[in-house]
Amino acid sequence: MARLAELYNKEMVPALMKDQNYKNIMEVPKLVKIVVNMGLGEAIQNVKILDSAAEELAAITGQRPVITKAKKSIAGFKLRQGMPIGCAVTLRREKMYEFLDRLVSVSLPRVRDFKGISGKAFDGKGNYSLGVKEQLIFPEIDYDKVDKIKGLNITIVTTAKTDAEGKALLKLMGLPFRN
């Protein structure tokens, strides 16, 4: 069992029940999934960029990504429906907890001028989205093999009903919020 999953079951659930006044253990919010997405507009001109991005995403998450395609054509961007424009990975269970643990303890501290993550990026339902400007903060990425710096989005989906519940859960998980 992942270290963070064990910590959640043994320490975080009782702490959240006491803190939020839950009567039933099933009311306690938990992580559902983590979606890591890399959108690549440059893939319209050069499809090889997509291959390197997929390899990097697979190295970061430990799971093979799905190539995302354009939903509709946009003439201004020279984009046709069905063209590959990015890649995404959905992590659940053990891999989800392991990824979040690595993100909090190893990757986020490697961000330049890091003062914590914003507490305002919740969606109103307790889910949190985080943007990473460069993939080099992950130790799995070899700096010499990177041809272009790419950003990625990380969405953490929880069962929390409100942003306050979601923030309390993620704070206990170790996410360093600024305010």
UniProtKB/Swiss-Prot annotation:
Any GO BP? translation
Q: Which GO terms describe its molecular function?
A: rRNA binding; structural constituent of ribosome; tRNA binding
Q: Which SUPFAM superfamilies match?
A: RL5-like
Q: Which cysteines are joined by disulfide bonds?
A: none
Q: Which domain of life is it from?
A: Bacteria
Keywords (alphabetical) are: Ribonucleoprotein, Ribosomal protein, RNA-binding, rRNA-binding, tRNA-binding
Which GO CC annotations does the UniProt entry carry? ribonucleoprotein complex; ribosome
**PROSITE patterns this protein is in?**
RIBOSOMAL_L5 (PS00358)
Q: What does this protein do?
A: This is one of the proteins that bind and probably mediate the attachment of the 5S RNA into the large ribosomal subunit, where it forms part of the central protuberance. In the 70S ribosome it contacts protein S13 of the 30S subunit (bridge B1b), connecting the 2 subunits; this bridge is implicated in subunit movement. Contacts the P site tRNA; the 5S rRNA and some of its associated proteins might help stabilize positioning of ribosome-bound tRNAs.
Q: Which HAMAP family match?
A: Ribosomal_uL5_B
Protein family membership: Belongs to the universal ribosomal protein uL5 family.
Q: What does the subunit comment say? A: Part of the 50S ribosomal subunit; part of the 5S rRNA/L5/L18/L25 subcomplex. Contacts the 5S rRNA and the P site tRNA. Forms a bridge to the 30S subunit in the 70S ribosome.
Q: What is this protein called?
A: Large ribosomal subunit protein uL5
Native species of this protein?
Citrifermentans bemidjiense (strain ATCC BAA-1014 / DSM 16622 / JCM 12645 / Bem) (Geobacter bemidjiensis)
User: Which gene underlies this protein?
Assistant: rplE
